[in-house]
Swiss-Prot record:
Family matches, as InterPro entries: High_potential_FeS_prot, HIPIP_sf
GO biological process: aerobic electron transport chain
Residues that coordinate or bind [4Fe-4S] cluster: 36, 39, 53, 67
Protein name in the entry: High-potential iron-sulfur protein isozyme 2
Keyword annotations from UniProtKB, A to Z: 4Fe-4S, Electron transport, Iron, Iron-sulfur, Metal-binding, Transport
Family: Belongs to the high-potential iron-sulfur protein (HiPIP) family.
Coiled-coil intervals: none
One MF term in the entry's GO annotations: metal ion binding
Protein purpose: Specific class of high-redox-potential 4Fe-4S ferredoxins. Functions in anaerobic electron transport in most purple and in some other photosynthetic bacteria and in at least one genus (Paracoccus) of halophilic, denitrifying bacteria.
Length: 74
């Protein structure tokens, strides 16, 4: 089945301060330059625009998005 794009209004997304656009994030735990595409939980690092995330298994997240579950690829 085709995955749906995650809504910023989704309850889990809101709990994790998810946003489609990391450039405007003001959250205390945000690190400059962090975004979905360079997160360990973005399960297909080659995905462009929208990709799968292990935190939101039924949805796609924005490549340039961010949430508080962000973990840097190491």
């Amino acid at each position: 089945a085709e995955l749906e794009r995650l809504s910023e209004d989704d309850a889990t997304a809101q709990a994790l301060s998810y946003t489609h656009d990391a450039s405007g994030v003001t959250h205390d735990s945000y690190q400059e330059g962090s975004r979905c595409s360079n997160c360990l939980l973005y399960s297909n690092p080659d995905a462009k625009d929208w990709g799968p995330c292990s935190v939101f298994p039924k949805h796609l997240v924005a490549e340039g998005g961010w949430c508080t579950a962000w973990v840097g690829r190491g």
